[in-house]
Amino acid sequence: MAKEEAIEVEGIVKESLPNTMFRVELKNGHVILAHLSGKMRKHYIKIVPGDTVKVALSPYDLTRGRIIFRER
């Protein structure tokens, strides 16, 4: 059985939470809880409120996501 494809959407970080968790408001208005991806943790990429980020959502739970890219 193949792994389901992640849904990639853009959003703006609204709040920084403990343990590299962030509250992100998506372009469609939904607010989700997102954590930092492993590569971003490894390379110490900092995320602050107000940053535009790309989030990967699982098709099974659309309220949680993984931040995979920070726009410059």
From Swiss-Prot:
Report the GO molecular function annotations: ribosome binding; rRNA binding; translation initiation factor activity
What is the annotated localization of this protein? Cytoplasm
Q: Answer yes or no on keyword Cell membrane.
A: no
Keyword flag Hydrolase: no
Cross-referenced InterPro entries, in alphabetical order? NA-bd_OB-fold, RNA-binding_domain_S1_IF1, S1_domain, TIF_IF1
Q: Which residues form the S1-like domain?
A: 1-72
This protein's GO cellular component annotations are: cytosol
Which PROSITE patterns does the UniProt entry name for this protein? S1_IF1_TYPE (PS50832)
Q: Any idea which UniProt keywords this protein has? A: Cytoplasm, Initiation factor, Protein biosynthesis, RNA-binding, rRNA-binding
What is the annotated signal peptide range for this record? Answer: none
* HAMAP family linked to this entry: IF_1 (MF_00075)
Describe its partners and assembly state.
Component of the 30S ribosomal translation pre-initiation complex which assembles on the 30S ribosome in the order IF-2 and IF-3, IF-1 and N-formylmethionyl-tRNA(fMet); mRNA recruitment can occur at any time during PIC assembly.
Instruction: Describe its function.
Output: One of the essential components for the initiation of protein synthesis. Stabilizes the binding of IF-2 and IF-3 on the 30S subunit to which N-formylmethionyl-tRNA(fMet) subsequently binds. Helps modulate mRNA selection, yielding the 30S pre-initiation complex (PIC). Upon addition of the 50S ribosomal subunit IF-1, IF-2 and IF-3 are released leaving the mature 70S translation initiation complex.
Q: Which family does this protein fall into?
A: Belongs to the IF-1 family.
What is the name attached to this protein's record?
Translation initiation factor IF-1
Originating organism: Treponema denticola (strain ATCC 35405 / DSM 14222 / CIP 103919 / JCM 8153 / KCTC 15104)
